[in-house]
Structures are given as structure tokens and as C-alpha cells.
A protein has these predicted regions:
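N-terminal "arm"/small-domain region of PLP-dependent enzymes with the aminotransferase-like
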Residues: 1-40
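PLP-dependent aminotransferase-like
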Residues: 75, 83-139
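PLP-dependent enzyme catalytic core of the Aspartate aminotransferase-like
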Residues: 343-381
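Active-site C-terminal subdomain of aminotransferase-like
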Residues: 21-22, 200-287
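Conserved PLP-binding catalytic core of the aspartate aminotransferase-like
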Residues: 295-326
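Conserved active-site segment immediately N-terminal to the catalytic lysine
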Residues: 188-200
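Conserved N-terminal alpha-helix of the aminotransferase class I/II PLP-enzyme fold
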Residues: 29-79, 83, 98, 102-106
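Active-site phosphate-binding strand-loop segment of PLP-dependent enzymes
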Residues: 125-181, 194
């Protein structure tokens, strides 16, 4: 579909961890003739969308499918935890950050048997400890973790964790919300049974559409598992798609049109070229922070290449809210950290941006520091 852009929308550079900066063509893809989402025409659009979502992670359409849900990324965690656990089994959450903690909270809410295997937020999981836990708990049927813990930017070893899950006959689910369609993923090579994401991050579309890419055979088997949710049930949503070509409940129509356009732009840019662009942005963020003297939370070689978490300066004139507002008024959004034991802020390499945007940002950011009297280079005690 040829998207007409009747005027240029004011462009903001979002350096928060999603939603991300979008193109005008994705924005205007939402302006379409009204349509009932139960029409066959719209069902055909969703079928193509679902197939593309599998192809992005190199899934075989004979083995993998995608299932759409209306909601934020957290709905995917809810769906997988409550839908994919057989009766009498338990979940192992490999947890080194806020987003794996969210999976633990979902388990607690539903009363699902689970093990919260916690590691420090600034360290990767110890694979020997993970294997020991699996060996000692043969009733673990599902292992879950987060690919890129967005609160810190640490990259978790999903391929190795998936291999361990499969060694002990468990299904492996991964929250790939902040890596999908950015950092290349291959579900078969990476030992992933289910991954999940939302349209507003790597795809550079809008909030409200989330999706799970997973093994069709496991979804079908889950039809016999306990039904713990009416809306957030994976098999029910999958089965309704397969029988009718429709979402079980009302879909976010305009967001789906925008996501289809975002997918077109993804394929036009290409997986490797897109990842190279995100890498350029990420490197430019590091260069800017290094020049000012900021310190990272996570070791450079353990970062996912998409989120930089930086420590607050030990400077009485540093005020994140004031610096944020200064940048925001000039078209740049920065974001607070999500680490309970450290004061941090985050700069992210998501969205339709390139390294020139980062250079422009650091001019404004440095102005803000100077305006409020923050010492440069940054001081730490």
C-alpha cells in the first residue's frame, strides 16, 4: 500500500526503551477507510502479518505460528505463564532484572507453582546454577527469561538457557520485547519455543498490539492444560484465528495497519542493515557518555547493544527531572533507570533514528548539564 504523507509531523527523538520514534509513513498508515475487523479483507491482512512475524525470527511456518493480542507487552508474559503450564508442573524463572521479576509476579498472581531463581541485576545468570535447579526439580515444565533486561541493558545467554531447558524436557519462553526485529534472533538456532514482543519497539509501530511467536504443536497440546484466564489464553486465541481468520475479541485496527507498514519498512531496510543502524546508534550513545565521563552499570561486553544504563553523577547540581525536561522541550526524551539499588538513567538505541540524532542529542544534553551547573567531566565519589 502506497502511504501518502500530507504533511510532516513534528519529530521527537525518543531515547526511552519504547515506544520508539516512528516514521511519518507508519503514522499515516493508520489513516484508512473505516472497516469492520470481521471482514475477510481485514482477516487476510492479519494472516499476512502473522506470517511475517514468524519470518522475522526465521521460524518455519510449518512448525511456528504467531498469535496476536490487544495489549501492552506484559500481556504476553501473562499469556505464556498461565497458558503453557500443565497441571502438576512448575515454572522456572531465570531472573536478573525487572522484566523477569514481572513474570514472577504473574506466577504469584495466578498461584502458579514456580521457582524464582534470582541473580544480581548486573550479572548474567550462572548456567551451572540453572542446570542444578533443573536437575533437582524434574517437575519444571517451563523455563522463562528475558533476552535483554531493559532495566539495565544486560544481554542474557538465551541459546544456552534454551539448550538446558530442552535437556531437561522443559519448554523455553523468552521475553524478546526489546530485541525482536532489532538484534537478530533465530528461534530454532537459539533453542526458543516461544518468544514475544510488541509493535511499538523493534518494529517501530505503535502501542496496543502484542504478539507471541511459538511452536504450533505446543500450543495445540496446551488445549488440555488448565484454563486460568478467559482473555489471556493462548490456545483459545490461536484456535479462533485458525477457525475464523479473526481475533477472538476486537483488534486494534489502526495499529495493525501501522504495523503492516512498519513490517514493509523492516523488510525494505533488511535485518542486517537495521541491526547495523541500531549498533551505530548504540555506539554513538557510548561515545557521548564517555566524552562526558558517565559510568555504565553493565560491563560493555555483556550489554545487548540497545540500552545503556548510566549511573547518576555524585554532583549536588544533578537533577534528572530538570535535565529530562530541558531535553524534552528540545525534542529529546531520556528515561529514568529501573534498578532498585542504584540511581540510573537510560538511553536507548531503538526506533527510527540514526547516529546523527545522537550527536544532536548530546549537544542538547551537554547544554542542560552546563545550564544546571553539573560538573563536566562527570564526578563520581
Amino acid at each position: 500500500m502506497d502511504i501518502k504523507v500530507p504533511y510532516e509531523v513534528k519529530r521527537n527523538v525518543l531515547l526511552n526503551p519504547g515506544p520508539s520514534t516512528t516514521t511519518d509513513t507508519v503514522k499515516f498508515a493508520q489513516i484508512v477507510p473505516d472497516i469492520c475487523p470481521r471482514e475477510a479483507e481485514f482477516g487476510g491482512l492479519m494472516k499476512g502479518l502473522r506470517e511475517d512475524l514468524v519470518k522475522i525470527v526465521h521460524g518455519d511456518l510449518d512448525k511456528y505460528t504467531s498469535v496476536l493480542f490487544c495489549g501492552s507487552g506484559t500481556i504476553n508474559i501473562d499469556v505464556c505463564m498461565n497458558s503453557l503450564l500443565p497441571e502438576g508442573k512448575k515454572i522456572l524463572v531465570v531472573n536478573n532484572g525487572a522484566y523477569s521479576t514481572r513474570a514472577v509476579e504473574v506466577c504469584e498472581y495466578y498461584g502458579l507453582p514456580h521457582i524464582n531463581l534470582k541473580f544480581p541485576v548486573d550479572q548474567r545468570p550462572d548456567l551451572e546454577v540453572v542446570e542444578k535447579t533443573l536437575k533437582e526439580n524434574p517437575d519444571i515444565a517451563l523455563v522463562h527469561t528475558t533476552h535483554n533486561e531493559t532495566g539495565t541493558g544486560i544481554l542474557n545467554p538465551i541459546r544456552e538457557l534454551g539448550a538446558l531447558a530442552h535437556k531437561y524436557n522443559a519448554v523455553f519462553t523468552v521475553d524478546t520485547t526489546s530485541t525482536y526485529a532489532m538484534r537478530p534472533i533465530n528461534v530454532e538456532e537459539d533453542n526458543i519455543d516461544f518468544c514475544m514482543a510488541s509493535a511499538q519497539k523493534g518494529l517501530m509501530a505503535f502501542t496496543g498490539l502484542s504478539f507471541i511467536v511459538g511452536r504450533t504443536d505446543v500450543i495445540k497440546a496446551s488445549a488440555e492444560y488448565p484454563k486460568r484466564s478467559y482473555y489471556c489464553n493462548l490456545f483459545m486465541q490461536y484456535d479462533f484465528f485458525e477457525r475464523t481468520g479473526e481475533m477472538h475479541f476486537t483488534p486494534p485496527v489502526q495499529t495493525i495497519y501501522a504495523t503492516i507498514q512498519a513490517l514493509n519498512e523492516y523488510w525494505a531496510e533488511g535485518e542486517q542493515a537495521k541491526w547495523a543502524r541500531h549498533t551505530r546508534v548504540f555506539n554513538a550513545i557510548h561515545e557521548g557518555l564517555d566524552e562526558l565521563g558517565f559510568k555504565d552499570v553493565i560491563k560493555r561486553d555483556e550489554q545487548a547493544g540497545l540500552v545503556v544504563s548510566a549511573l547518576y553523577p555524585d554532583d549536588p547540581n544533578w537533577d534528572f527531572s530538570k535535565v529530562h525536561d530541558y531535553c524534552y522541550e528540545r525534542g529529546f526524551t531520556i528515561y529514568p533507570g529501573k534498578i532498585s539499588n542504584a540511581k540510573t538513567f537510560r538511553l536507548c538505541a531503538l526506533g527510527a533514528i540514526d547516529e546523527q540524532d545522537i550527536k544532536d542529542f548530546f549537544k542538547v544534553f551537554k547544554e542542560a548539564l552546563e545550564y544546571y551547573g553539573v560538573c563536566i567531566p562527570i564526578r563520581y565519589n
